[in-house]
From Swiss-Prot:
The lineage of its organism: Eukaryota, Metazoa, Chordata, Craniata, Vertebrata. It holds the Pfam family Nkap_C. This is NKAP-like protein. The modification Phosphoserine is found at residues 23, 25, 149. Specific to testis (at protein level). Detected in differenting spermatogonia and early spermatocytes (at protein level). It comes from Mus musculus (Mouse). It is found in: Nucleus. InterPro entries: NKAP, NKAP_C. One of its GO terms (biological process) is cell differentiation. Disulfide bonds: none annotated. Interacts with RBPJ, CIR1 and HDAC3. Residues 1-77, 91-247 are annotated as: Disordered.
Length: 395
């Protein structure tokens, strides 16, 4: 333990000498004395015995203190001690004097902090603009909106004034009615109160008058019953009188008059000779021209077929059939595949119309043939009937 106590004054003297050197040395010397690993001033302040605290920081303890060798332990070599001291950030005043000039992570952190502060500033400014607005940019909105020329025309203003005046008039009428009704109610209320008071005071008088009221009611009921019975008798007598008068008039009128009236009523229904019954032909009925046709297209095409004309095609309106035929002969057609497709559609539609027209012609022909057969059969039957009746008459 005696060698340890002897070495303490030597350590104090060495630390004071090193502090003086550090304070007296120029900045160029300090920069050159930094270790290549970024350890700072560890090589200047680190001694063989251990680390010394920097000037002005007596209370700060080193992060990695090097303990003295105890009894029975081997002390560390000098190079390892200096490296350990130089690697610590607080050793030799490194924490207080180094500016991180060559550290890229420190520069990135500084830039991030600046960006974050700028964002916060911009956010606060935007919130302020959203709340208060920016009159230097947009200007303040007008307190009273300007009247629009389309919305506020003089005619509309007059109509609005009339409506407002009529509504005011109706409101005044309602108010007067309500005031009258309230006055009447107020007038009625005291009368009820008076009546109640009178009723309470003269309860005995009312008990005596109740019997009189009942008698009056019974008399009124009897009168009503008698009146109803008289009315029923009058109605019965009127009905009987009417029946008797009708019977007497029937007896007086002859039967010929009734026959003439019925005949005249029957003749009034139909005036003039009856029209002959005409069988509706199939030509008048709407014919189905097939599917995939526009409404009215089939009928319009059938009209051209009936007239014996060529059905006009798309783009041929205003041209005669002869002009169209001459154009087709000279080689004017639609362009390419579209012409082929349009031609196919046109041919299909025309075939539908022609087939429908042929069906109609066949149906009309069959109908005419049937009518002819029926007429022949009817004529032969009439001749046969006439012969038989004539032979009987001769006998």
């Amino acid at each position: 333990m005696s060698p340890v106590s002897r070495s303490r004054p030597n350590e104090d003297t060495l630390g004071s000498q090193k502090r003086r050197r550090f304070s007296e040395s120029p900045p160029s010397a300090l920069q050159t004395s930094r270790s290549p690993r970024g350890g700072g001033f560890g090589s200047l302040l680190s001694g063989p015995e251990g680390l010394q605290p920097p000037r002005g920081a007596q209370g700060v303890r080193p992060l990695h203190p090097i303990s003295r060798p105890r009894s029975g332990e081997r002390p560390l070599p000098l190079g390892i001690r200096t490296l350990a001291c130089s690697s610590s950030p607080i050793c030799g005043g490194y924490r207080y004097h180094h500016n991180y000039a060559g550290d890229p992570s420190w520069a990135e952190d500084q830039e991030k902090e600046k960006e974050e502060s700028y964002r916060q500033r911009r956010l606060k400014e935007r919130e302020r603009i959203g709340e208060l607005g920016a009159p230097e940019v947009w200007g303040l909105s007008p307190k009273i909106p300007e009247p629009d020329s389309d919305e506020h025309t003089p005619a509309e203003d007059e109509v609005k004034n009339q409506k407002s005046s009529s509504s005011d008039f109706t409101n005044e009428e309602k108010r007067t009615k309500t005031s009258h009704s309230t006055k009447k109610k107020r007038k009625k209320k005291p009368s009820k109160r008076k009546h109640k008071k009178y009723y309470d005071s003269s309860s005995d008088c009312h008990s005596s008058s109740d019997s009189d009221k009942k008698k009056v009611k019974t008399k009124k009921k009897e009168k009503k019953k008698k009146h109803r019975a008289k009315q029923l008798k009058k109605k019965r007598t009127k009905k009987e009188y009417n029946d008797i008068s009708c019977k007497a008039s029937e007896r007086d009128l002859p039967e010929d008059a009734w026959m003439e009236q019925s005949m005249s009523a029957e003749s009034m229904d139909l005036i003039g000779p009856e029209a002959p019954v005409i069988h509706t032909s199939q030509d008048e009925k709407p014919l189905n021209y097939g599917h995939a046709l526009l409404p009215g297209e089939g009928a319009a095409m059938a009209e051209y077929v009936k007239a014996g004309k060529r059905i006009p095609r798309r783009g041929e309106i205003g041209l005669t059939s002869e002009e169209i035929a001459s154009f087709e002969c000279s080689g004017y057609v639609m362009s390419g595949s579209r012409h082929r497709r349009m031609e196919a559609v046109r041919l299909r539609k025309e075939n539908q119309i022609y087939s429908a027209d042929e069906k109609r012609a066949l149906a009309s022909f069959n109908q005419e043939e049937r009518r002819k057969r029926e007429n022949k059969i009817l004529a032969s039957f009439r001749e046969m009937v006439y012969r038989k009746t004539k032979g009987k008459d001769d006998k």
